[in-house]
């Protein structure tokens, strides 16, 4: 029948004289489309030939109904062709009995209704469709899983307040639960979802589900019209029921004029202009402070230079000035080695006088016949001999100031200094022994005249008091010690040397028997007070024989002193029982302690070597010639 209607409609559309105008053609096409849809549905149903369940629904958790499709038997009121059976599954019953639908009419066509007498919760149901005794579809479910409440009813809204600009308003929407749901007694608990949109919009805005029957809506435009709809679901379920009827909301305007669009502050433009202004200011600051910013971002690399040295001197090549500047700094001074030609100075640390009161070697040496007070000129040099060596004039002035002697002694000193400068010729002509000294007996004083005096620096004994002891003890020279090492410093600041090898046998003397007259101001020594160097006035004793003398003003051993001493001492005949004479010591070997020094023995002069008659300090070449 439907097919014949479709063919008739197409025939009518094909005739151009039947309808006039575009509207008539549109209506005809719509009718033809509906007819084709019906024919297609009939063809699909008839082609499959099997009815199916469409849905099973419980509106209030007390009753439920199931619906199915049967287009092939449309219009037939007899139920003999399609039947629905149900059963309640029970794990204890193995053979379950299927029962036919209790009501085919109450829920509508092609449906089965189960009232409260046939409905049980917490139990599974299974339903099936049969056609002419054969099963065509089957479905199992729980009643609480198919709950889809009816739509809420009684929707209305209330205006709560409006904004000060009369542009926005707040409302509250209320509704009632579904009539079929027993919400008051608590048999069922529902959640409600509200959806809202403007009238001219197509997209609904969903609100969060609530359990109450009222929802506030804020900031609604007063010049707009809104649509609201609500649906419900069982709590903890995801199946919503049908939507309620649409509620139309039109907010009243407070002024007779049409509400215009709200004035929006131009934040975007302000941000653009602000960024532009900040950029301009930053560029201005960068250009004005370009050098300083460059120094902060890229600090300059420091130029390599020597502290205290002007780099212009290095560029100009003035090496003499650079060397002078480097010599001022201690860390730039060259180190002295043993083979260096520079003079090495000895620095002695003087201990407290309280630490040397008892048990010192000085008391032992000064208590016996070995006590010989040379009354040597003493002065403590605070710079370890630098001033006395390089500035002899200053030291002589200090000695004269501290000496306390009269100015009558100065001509004698100058005369002796002149004699010391050129002693080579005098000593060669006036030497009591013309033969060159024996290497083993050089620089040895005859034992009969005077015993060798230890280099003991004292300050109280005089030459007049020691003269009887020197004459009365002529044999003690053989047993006297040479002192080669500093062993102690007395509380008064005097230096005591340690004894060396003894000469046990007596030494023969020259025929002239010269007596070595040592001037007592030919050595520097340190007193107890390091700040006030004292100078002892020498007492020169006139001897009958010509004696080698040392320079009085110079506190250090010079070439002339060594040369004169070597030439004046004759080659005495060695006793058979005597030992080899000890040489003088000229250099430091080991520093054992701040007060202990071991000196290296210098080689005795050979017979064929001649001493240089140079004036001044001992140079390296002269010292090597003396030591050979």
From Swiss-Prot:
Residues that carry a glycan? 33, 40, 46, 115, 156, 161, 200
The alphabetized list of GO BP terms reads: endocytosis
| TM region positions | 267-287
Q: Name one GO cellular component term.
A: external side of plasma membrane
Q: Where in the cell is it found?
A: Cell membrane
Query: Where is it mostly found?
Result: membrane
Q: InterPro entries of this UniProt entry? A: FN3_dom, FN3_sf, GHBP, Growth/epo_recpt_lig-bind, Ig-like_fold, Long_hematopoietin_rcpt_CS
Protein name in UniProt: Growth hormone receptor
> Is-annotated flag, keyword Cell division?
no
Its UniProt domain note says: The WSXWS motif appears to be necessary for proper protein folding and thereby efficient intracellular transport and cell-surface receptor binding.
Which stretch is the leader sequence?
1-18
Query: Among its keywords, does the record have NADP?
Result: no
Q: Which residues carry this modification: Phosphoserine?
A: 341
Q: Which residues carry this modification: Phosphotyrosine?
A: 483, 585
Locate the motif WSXWS motif: 240-244
> Which organism was this protein described from?
Cavia porcellus
For region Required for JAK2 binding, the annotated ranges are: 294-379
Q: Which cysteines are joined by disulfide bonds?
A: 56-66, 101-112, 126-140
């Amino acid at each position: 029948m439907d097919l014949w209607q479709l063919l008739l409609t197409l025939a009518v559309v094909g005739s151009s004289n039947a309808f006039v105008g575009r509207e008539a053609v549109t209506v005809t096409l719509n009718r033809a489309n509906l007819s084709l849809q019906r024919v297609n549905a009939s063809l699909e149903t008839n082609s499959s030939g099997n009815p199916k369940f469409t849905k099973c629904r419980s509106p209030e958790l007390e009753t439920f109904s199931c619906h199915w499709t049967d287009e092939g038997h449309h219009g037939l009121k007899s139920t003999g062709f399609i039947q629905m059976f149900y059963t309640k599954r029970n794990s204890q019953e193995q053979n379950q009995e299927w029962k036919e639908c209790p009501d085919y009419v109450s829920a509508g066509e092609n449906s089965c209704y189960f009232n409260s007498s046939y409905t049980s919760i917490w139990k599974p149901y299974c339903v099936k469709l049969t056609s002419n005794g054969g099963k065509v579809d089957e479905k199992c479910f729980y009643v609480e899983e198919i709950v889809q409440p009816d739509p809420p009813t009684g929707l209305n809204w209330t205006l709560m307040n409006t904004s000060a600009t009369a542009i926005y308003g707040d409302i509250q929407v209320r509704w009632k639960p579904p009539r079929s749901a027993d919400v008051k007694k608590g048999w069922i608990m529902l959640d409600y979802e509200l959806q809202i949109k403007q009238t001219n919009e197509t997209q609904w805005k969903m609100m969060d589900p609530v359990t109450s029957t009222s929802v506030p809506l804020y900031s609604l435009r007063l010049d707009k019209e809104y649509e609201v709809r609500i649906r419900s679901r069982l709590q903890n379920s995801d199946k919503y029921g049908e939507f309620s009827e649409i509620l139309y909301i039109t907010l009243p305007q407070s002024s007779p004029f049409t509400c215009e669009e709200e004035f929006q502050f131009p934040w975007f433009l302000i941000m653009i202009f602000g960024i532009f202004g900040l950029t301009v200011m930053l560029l201005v600051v960068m250009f004005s402070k370009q050098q300083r910013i460059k120094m902060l971002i890229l600090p300059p690399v420091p130029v390599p230079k020597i502290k205290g040295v002007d780099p212009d001197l290095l560029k100009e090549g003035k090496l003499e000035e650079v060397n002078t500047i480097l010599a001022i700094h201690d860390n730039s001074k060259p180190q002295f080695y043993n083979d260096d030609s520079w003079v090495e100075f000895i620095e002695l640390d003087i201990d407290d006088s309280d630490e040397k009161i008892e048990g010192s070697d000085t008391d032992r040496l000064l208590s016996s016949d070995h006590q010989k007070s040379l009354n040597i000129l003493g002065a403590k040099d605070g710079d370890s001999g630098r001033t006395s060596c390089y500035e002899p004039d200053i030291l002589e002035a200090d000695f004269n100031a501290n000496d306390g002697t009269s100015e009558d002694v100065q001509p004698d000193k100058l005369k002796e200094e002149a004699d010391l400068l050129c002693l080579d010729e005098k000593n060669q002509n006036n030497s009591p022994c013309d033969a060159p000294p024996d290497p083993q007996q050089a620089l040895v004083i005859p034992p009969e005249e005077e015993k060798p005096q230890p280099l003991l620096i004292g300050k109280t004994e005089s030459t007049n008091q020691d003269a009887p002891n020197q004459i009365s003890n002529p044999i003690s020279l053989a047993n006297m010690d040479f002192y080669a090492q500093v062993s102690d410093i007395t509380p008064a600041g005097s230096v005591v040397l340690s004894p060396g090898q003894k000469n046990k046998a007596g030494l023969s003397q020259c025929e002239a028997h010269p007596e070595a007259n040592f001037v007592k101001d030919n050595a520097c020594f340190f007193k107890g007070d390091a700040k006030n160097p004292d100078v002892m006035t020498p007492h020169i004793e006139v001897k009958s024989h010509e004696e080698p003398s040392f320079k009085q003003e110079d506190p250090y051993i010079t070439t002339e002193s060594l040369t004169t001493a070597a030439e004046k001492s004759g080659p005495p005949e060695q006793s058979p029982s005597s030992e080899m004479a000890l040489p003088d010591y000229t250099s430091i070997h080991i520093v054992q302690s701040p007060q202990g020094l071991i000196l290296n023995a210098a080689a005795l002069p050979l017979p064929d070597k001649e001493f240089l008659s140079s004036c001044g300090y001992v140079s390296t070449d002269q010292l090597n010639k003396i030591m050979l």
